[in-house]
Amino acid sequence: MDVINCEEVKRDEFHTEKYYDSYNIFGAHIVTEDGMRGVRCTVWAPHAKAMSVVGDFNEWDYEQHKMLQVTEEGIWSLFVPHIEENEIYKYAIETMDGDVILKADPYAVYAEVRPNTASVVFDIEGYEWNDKNWIRKRKKKSIYKEAMTVYELHFGSWKKKEDGALYSYREMAEELIPYVVEHQFTHIEIMPLVEHPYDRSWGYQGTGYYAATSRFGTPHDLMYFVDECHKYGIGVILDWVPGHFCKDAHGLYLFDGTPTYEYKDRDVQENLVWGTVNFDLGKREVRNFLISNALFWMKYFHIDGFRVDAVANMLYWNKEGKEQSNEHAVSFLRELNEAVFAEDEEFLMTAEDSTAWPLVTAPTYEGGLGFNYKWNMGWMNDVLKYMECAPEYRKYIHEKMTFSLIYAHSENFILPLSHDEVVHGKKSLLNKMPGDYWDKFAQLRLLYGYFFTHPGKKLLFMGGEFGQFDEWKDLEDLDWNLHDFEMHRNMHDYFKELIALYKRSKPLWQLDHSPEGFQWIDANNNEQSIFSFIRQGDKQEDALVVVCNFTKATYENYKVGVPDFEYYNEILNSDSAQYGGSGQVNKKRLKTILEPYHNQAAHVEITIPPFGVSILRPVKTRKGSKKQDGSKTKVRSNVTSRGKR
């Protein structure tokens, strides 16, 4: 780390200007000064009366290592000689009221294992990376026109040892990576790994933003994990929470006895949703802390993306009973994204946002927030409500399955089947499905078929791939014993085949962010709850026809309008017996009938299985074939894609 002596920094630079490598000033850095080895400790505490560095090295004596105030705005610093790596320490802060409080270092890169709360001196440098090829290849790809399948997981509950102990970062590399590779996920998304005191906050209520949690090992161990992911072609996305933080006494809350990192105004300071406090995003020092933190994770841990948590909670605050936009947060998010993309244009910045705020994924120079992806929470909520409805009543809420296509290309979307939907009494995805045992599995296969063929990149929370019956239990690992049961094994096989089909089928992702990539065949068959549509790639022959049946009825010789190719093959049927279905499949090549149907030039007659999805691929095109309206077979639109920056 390029340690900068705080006395060399312009007096007001950190307080008034964009300073995105503030981690080089603040924190505890192993250095040699005047020929003596030790640690330089620097911290910002604007309302402290006095400060000391304390730890085992001085028996936690507040009087021994007094810090010097080097700026009027509250930067304090001290060189502590003769202490080395792995020394524990805190800051003893005398408040304006005369009390002395102990605080962990906001910029510490390592911390004690909970329940202990001290910071730990650690040299973040020294890890030898082996991922140059990965980084080079990633930066050459356009993330918008590639397949993206994200496996969301909680590090502490994906799998545990027989005695219930947690796997370390290095052990997880051995356990998790082969599993992810087998399933052909392109990325993993890990719930927050910043240091946090309470296991059941899942990392979303942090105290040490620069410290990879010591529950699983050292920062270098996490670097090894990321390096191994890159070795096997897996991108790593981290959940990151720049909106709020916890109130634990050793953390950022009332850091110098007064609101420092949080808003001073209690009306906007308190985050009533989670019992936390909101970052004061209008304060330059706080912005520098957070944006430096994002760039720190990029630089030192080589991560490939952030999922920015609770953006909706940042964009709006409830002040005096009225919902108002938070202009501090809006400008912060724009500044954050500009800083990130200045470092890496192909980095993933995903907003978890449930609002209708416009232009979330538009560049800031076009008036947008500057993210390149947004979770499609509306799609998730509508689809899951539809699936939870009894099949015979789905015809009355038919629009929940079609509404998302009205706005599907207004942003660059990721479709999330995330952890939030399988916890706190919401049931697992499998158990959300109505009906008996067979019905549940059939409908989950159907849901996944619709999920992988709908425009948007894909995200699935751990356990969904094999049909976890119980909802997520964060203190236990997944129910791996379910593989002893045939239907779960069949579900797992189906999911792996579906994701493999998705990755090798350009129509399912090449034009995700363009209206040209999707066309309804029939969106209006609410009586039978059958939906059919076309997914289109760049080339005319890159087209797939998808038919989804959301009831248990079976239909023979069902007419489906199709582009005029000579034949179609069914390349996937969720009702196949090998996946646990009833076997109502279309084994033979389907010859098109040159009679217009569904505003297409031709049609095929197929068997539609119960609770089934059927995917058809054209085999051969007729010369000069056209649709009924006289246009070329290939699906096209004059609307410009927003999948660009």
From Swiss-Prot:
Catalytic activities: Transfers a segment of a (1->4)-alpha-D-glucan chain to a primary hydroxy group in a similar glucan chain
UniProt pathway: Glycan biosynthesis; glycogen biosynthesis
Enzyme Commission code: 2.4.1.18
GO biological process: glycogen biosynthetic process
Keywords recorded for this protein, A-Z: Carbohydrate metabolism, Glycogen biosynthesis, Glycogen metabolism, Glycosyltransferase, Transferase
Residue stretches of biased makeup (Polar residues): 636-645
Keyword Transferase: yes
First-level EC class: transferase
SUPFAM superfamilies: (Trans)glycosidases, Glycosyl hydrolase domain
GO molecular function terms noted in the UniProt entry: 1,4-alpha-glucan branching enzyme activity; cation binding; hydrolase activity, hydrolyzing O-glycosyl compounds
Chain segments carrying region Disordered: 619-645
Any Pfam family the entry gives: Alpha-amylase
Protein origin, superkingdom: Bacteria
Catalytic center residues: D309, E352
UniProt similarity note: Belongs to the glycosyl hydrolase 13 family. GlgB subfamily.
PANTHER family assigned: 1,4-ALPHA-GLUCAN-BRANCHING ENZYME
Protein name: 1,4-alpha-glucan branching enzyme GlgB
